[in-house]
Amino acid sequence: MTLLTLSDLLTLLRECAGEEESIDLGGDVEDVAFDALGYDSLALLNTVGRIERDYGVQLGDDAVEKATTPRALIEMTNASLTGASPSAGGAARDK
Protein backbone atom coordinates (compact mmCIF):
# COMPACT_ATOMS: atom_id res chain seq x y z
CA MET A 1 0.00 0.00 0.00
CA THR A 2 1.32 3.41 -0.97
CA LEU A 3 0.73 6.20 1.53
CA LEU A 4 0.28 9.82 0.50
CA THR A 5 3.36 11.96 1.13
CA LEU A 6 3.73 15.73 1.19
CA SER A 7 5.58 15.55 -2.12
CA ASP A 8 2.73 13.51 -3.64
CA LEU A 9 0.13 15.97 -2.36
CA LEU A 10 2.00 19.00 -3.67
CA THR A 11 2.30 17.34 -7.08
CA LEU A 12 -1.45 16.65 -7.11
CA LEU A 13 -2.24 20.23 -6.04
CA ARG A 14 -0.08 21.60 -8.85
CA GLU A 15 -1.65 19.25 -11.41
CA CYS A 16 -5.24 19.93 -10.27
CA ALA A 17 -5.07 23.65 -9.58
CA GLY A 18 -1.73 25.11 -10.54
CA GLU A 19 0.66 26.93 -8.27
CA GLU A 20 0.43 30.46 -6.92
CA GLU A 21 3.58 32.24 -8.11
CA SER A 22 4.06 34.13 -4.86
CA ILE A 23 3.96 30.96 -2.72
CA ASP A 24 7.04 28.76 -2.28
CA LEU A 25 5.71 25.21 -2.06
CA GLY A 26 9.29 24.02 -1.65
CA GLY A 27 9.38 25.31 1.92
CA ASP A 28 7.85 23.99 5.12
CA VAL A 29 4.17 24.10 4.13
CA GLU A 30 2.71 21.10 5.99
CA ASP A 31 0.96 23.27 8.57
CA VAL A 32 0.12 26.26 6.36
CA ALA A 33 -3.58 26.64 5.59
CA PHE A 34 -4.53 25.81 2.01
CA ASP A 35 -6.06 29.26 1.51
CA ALA A 36 -2.75 30.86 2.56
CA LEU A 37 -1.09 28.69 -0.10
CA GLY A 38 -3.48 30.09 -2.71
CA TYR A 39 -5.80 27.06 -2.97
CA ASP A 40 -9.55 27.63 -2.68
CA SER A 41 -12.28 25.08 -2.00
CA LEU A 42 -12.72 24.26 -5.70
CA ALA A 43 -9.02 23.45 -6.03
CA LEU A 44 -9.25 21.24 -2.95
CA LEU A 45 -12.37 19.47 -4.23
CA ASN A 46 -10.51 18.64 -7.44
CA THR A 47 -7.48 17.46 -5.48
CA VAL A 48 -9.53 15.35 -3.04
CA GLY A 49 -11.33 13.77 -6.00
CA ARG A 50 -8.00 12.91 -7.58
CA ILE A 51 -6.70 11.45 -4.29
CA GLU A 52 -9.83 9.32 -3.97
CA ARG A 53 -9.43 8.06 -7.53
CA ASP A 54 -5.65 7.52 -7.48
CA TYR A 55 -5.47 6.00 -3.99
CA GLY A 56 -8.80 4.15 -4.00
CA VAL A 57 -10.11 5.78 -0.81
CA GLN A 58 -13.30 7.58 0.17
CA LEU A 59 -12.53 10.71 2.19
CA GLY A 60 -16.11 11.90 2.50
CA ASP A 61 -17.94 15.04 1.50
CA ASP A 62 -16.53 17.04 4.40
CA ALA A 63 -12.86 16.29 3.68
CA VAL A 64 -12.26 19.75 2.22
CA GLU A 65 -13.82 21.43 5.25
CA LYS A 66 -11.97 19.29 7.81
CA ALA A 67 -8.55 19.16 6.18
CA THR A 68 -7.44 22.78 6.20
CA THR A 69 -3.70 22.09 5.87
CA PRO A 70 -1.58 19.67 3.86
CA ARG A 71 -0.72 17.75 7.06
CA ALA A 72 -4.40 17.27 7.91
CA LEU A 73 -5.25 16.04 4.39
CA ILE A 74 -2.28 13.67 4.36
CA GLU A 75 -3.23 12.27 7.78
CA MET A 76 -6.87 11.89 6.73
CA THR A 77 -5.89 10.08 3.53
CA ASN A 78 -3.36 7.79 5.16
CA ALA A 79 -5.75 6.97 8.01
CA SER A 80 -8.32 5.94 5.43
CA LEU A 81 -5.73 3.82 3.63
CA THR A 82 -4.60 2.04 6.80
CA GLY A 83 -7.98 1.86 8.52
CA ALA A 84 -6.75 4.00 11.43
CA SER A 85 -8.32 7.20 12.69
CA PRO A 86 -6.47 10.46 11.95
CA SER A 87 -4.18 11.55 14.75
CA ALA A 88 -5.43 14.17 17.16
CA GLY A 89 -2.58 16.39 16.04
CA GLY A 90 -3.87 16.82 12.50
CA ALA A 91 -7.45 17.49 11.57
CA ALA A 92 -8.59 18.24 15.10
CA ARG A 93 -5.83 20.78 15.62
CA ASP A 94 -6.73 22.58 12.40
CA LYS A 95 -10.28 23.43 13.47
UniProtKB/Swiss-Prot annotation:
PTMs per UniProt: 4'-phosphopantetheine is transferred from CoA to a specific serine of the apo-ACP-like protein.
GO biological process, any: antibiotic biosynthetic process
Record pathway: Antibiotic biosynthesis; oxytetracycline biosynthesis
O-(pantetheine 4'-phosphoryl)serine found at: 41
Entry keyword set: Antibiotic biosynthesis, Phosphopantetheine, Phosphoprotein
SUPFAM superfamilies in the cross-refs: ACP-like
Domain named Carrier: residues: 3-81
Domain of life per record: Bacteria
Gene3D superfamilies in the cross-refs: ACP-like
Biological role: Acyl carrier protein.
Protein name: Oxytetracycline polyketide synthase acyl carrier protein
